[in-house]
């Protein structure tokens, strides 16, 4: 038995029964999104350390920030893909072309994910609006 398991992604269903009492597992668990995963880890009696909850003394989340940056940037790429007619979209090109206005992107939330989504959308030439409750 391994005493410690270090992963990037959360354990998949096929791995649940392999987790044993007392093992320490470091990974991005995202427990809020999977009741089944949460219950499996509770039942295993393993020590689960979720990267996304590790805090610096100032309260920042140093292990969540890089993944959030990637998520924000990927959101624009995925959204752009689904604007293509081949994907059932309306054939909108986010950056536009000469004579055609660029697409409009509304980003809800100005946290790490939202800011990176806005940067990516601006980078491809979209018209970008950001909405957030915090004016800072």
Regions found by a protein language model. Give the residues of each.
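Glycine-rich phosphate/diphosphate-binding loop of Rossmann-like nucleotide-binding domains
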Residues: 88-136
């Amino acid at each position: 038995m391994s005493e410690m398991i270090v992963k990037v992604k959360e354990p998949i269903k096929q791995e649940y029964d392999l987790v044993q009492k007392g093992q320490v597992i470091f990974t991005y668990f995202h427990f809020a999104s999977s009741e089944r995963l949460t219950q499996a880890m509770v039942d295993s009696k393993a020590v689960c350390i979720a990267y996304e909850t590790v805090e610096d003394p100032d309260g920042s989340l140093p292990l969540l920030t890089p993944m959030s940056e990637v998520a924000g940037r990927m959101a624009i790429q995925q959204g752009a893909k689904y604007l293509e007619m081949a994907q059932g979209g309306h054939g909108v090109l986010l950056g536009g072309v000469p004579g055609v206005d660029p697409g409009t992107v509304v980003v809800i939330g100005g946290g790490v994910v939202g800011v990176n989504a806005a940067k990516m959308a601006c980078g491809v030439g979209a018209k970008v609006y950001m909405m957030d409750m915090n004016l800072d």
